[in-house]
UniProtKB/Swiss-Prot annotation:
Functional note: Involved in gene transcription regulation. Acts in concert with the corepressor URI1 to regulate androgen receptor AR-mediated transcription. Together with URI1, associates with chromatin to the NKX3-1 promoter region. Negatively regulates the transcriptional activity of the estrogen receptor ESR1 by inducing its translocation into the cytoplasm. May act as nuclear chaperone that facilitates the formation of the NF-kappa-B enhanceosome and thus positively regulates NF-kappa-B transcription activity.
Intrachain disulfide bonds: none
Organism for this UniProt entry: Bos taurus (Bovine)
Any Gene Ontology biological process: negative regulation of transcription by RNA polymerase II
CDD domains in the record: Prefoldin_UXT
Designated gene of the protein: UXT
Protein family membership: Belongs to the UXT family.
GO CC terms: centrosome; chromatin; cytoplasm; cytosol; mediator complex; nucleus; spindle pole
Source organism superkingdom: Eukaryota
Keyword Lipid biosynthesis (UniProt): no
One function term, GO molecular function aspect: chromatin binding
Primary residence: cytoplasm
Keywords associated with the record: Activator, Chaperone, Cytoplasm, Cytoskeleton, Nucleus, Repressor, Transcription, Transcription regulation
This protein's name: Protein UXT
Length: 156
């Protein structure tokens, strides 16, 4: 016995709805989470560089040749130490490389690195907004496909 045309149309619509929902949850939401996680890591790096800039500026203001401080050896185990010369600092460049720089050179490096990280975070924010727009567009398409009415959006 043949399936009535209306029933086939309903089944085809239901199949399309399932495919769109799967695409939203399996692809778009996963991509959005990856972009947001990457942006959070960039923000963490940026915060570390800004903290380093504050330390360097304090060192320049203090103008001492020797520095007494505590160093974390890991697991919150601190030891007292003396830094005999504060005119130079080792800065992590990335990928396990460190470079000895003067305080002025380190500030220039931090400014450049901060601007690059800010630009990267802005691009990641734009990417996340694009993905959110695609999700919203697909949800609107699903709403129309299912014949649902417009519901007022709740304010967050």
């Amino acid at each position: 016995m043949a399936t009535p045309p209306k029933r086939r149309a309903v089944e085809a619509t239901a199949e399309k709805v399932l495919r769109y929902e799967a695409f939203i949850s399996d692809v778009l939401q996963r991509d959005l989470q990856k972009v947001l996680d990457h942006r959070d890591k960039v923000y963490e790096q940026l915060a570390k560089y800004l903290q380093l800039r504050n330390v360097i500026e304090r060192l320049q203001e203090a103008n001492h040749s020797e520095l007494y401080m505590q160093v974390d050896l890991g697991c919150n185990f601190f030891v007292d130490t003396v830094v005999p010369d504060t005119s130079r600092i080792y800065v992590a460049l990335g990928y396990g490389f460190f470079l000895e720089l003067t305080l002025a050179e380190a500030l220039k490096f931090i400014d450049r690195k901060s601007s690059l990280l800010t630009e990267l975070s802005d691009n990641l924010t734009k990417d996340s907004m694009n993905i959110k727009a695609h999700i919203h567009m697909l949800l609107e398409g699903l709403r129309e496909l299912q014949g649902l009415q417009n519901f007022p959006e709740t304010q967050h």
